[in-house]
Amino acid sequence: MLTPKRVKHRKQHRPSLAGKANKGNTITYGDYGLQALEPAWITNRQIEAARIAINRYVKRGGKLWIKIFPDRPLTVKPAETRMGKGKGSPEHWVAVVKPGRVMFELSGVSEEVAREAMRLAAHKLPVKCKFLKREEMGGEVSES
């Protein structure tokens, strides 16, 4: 699972989802990408599930880049606990994804293989996604 090795503060405020992605919104490494169309918190387990889905489909071919990292802790208080008595314990780590953020990049495979692998990964994520090609940086919407 993706988690930070060290953090300065164990508990943080909840991350904001306002606005659009102003960095990480272009394909930089691979030939194909998966771009978020909605804001969301994506957990380390969801990122791992998408990574496994892509790797299973492309098998030994291609190189995958994961361009998001879950660096924000989400805390949860136990069930049936009264208000107060401090902040809850960290439950899991999330990556803040804003619209336009390219989350995964893939190269070394054909367009058909990349499109299907990204479609499978999009089903594992809680956001609507778009498949991108480096040449056009446009794409089509994939419901998830």
From Swiss-Prot:
GO cellular component terms given for this protein: cytosolic large ribosomal subunit
SUPFAM superfamilies in the cross-refs: Ribosomal protein L16p/L10e (SSF54686)
GO biological process: translation
Region (Disordered): 1-22
Record-linked PROSITE patterns: RIBOSOMAL_L16_1, RIBOSOMAL_L16_2
Keyword DNA-binding part of the UniProt annotation: no
GO molecular function: rRNA binding; structural constituent of ribosome; tRNA binding
Disulfide bonds: none
Compositionally biased residues, Basic residues: 1-14
UniProt keyword list: Ribonucleoprotein, Ribosomal protein, RNA-binding, rRNA-binding, tRNA-binding
Top-level taxonomic group: Bacteria
Assembly information from the UniProt record: Part of the 50S ribosomal subunit.
HAMAP family per the UniProt record, alphabetical: Ribosomal_uL16 (MF_01342)
Stored NCBIfam families: rplP_bact
UniProt similarity note: Belongs to the universal ribosomal protein uL16 family.
Known role: Binds 23S rRNA and is also seen to make contacts with the A and possibly P site tRNAs.
Protein name, per record: Large ribosomal subunit protein uL16
Organism: Syntrophomonas wolfei subsp. wolfei (strain DSM 2245B / Goettingen)
UniProt gene name: rplP
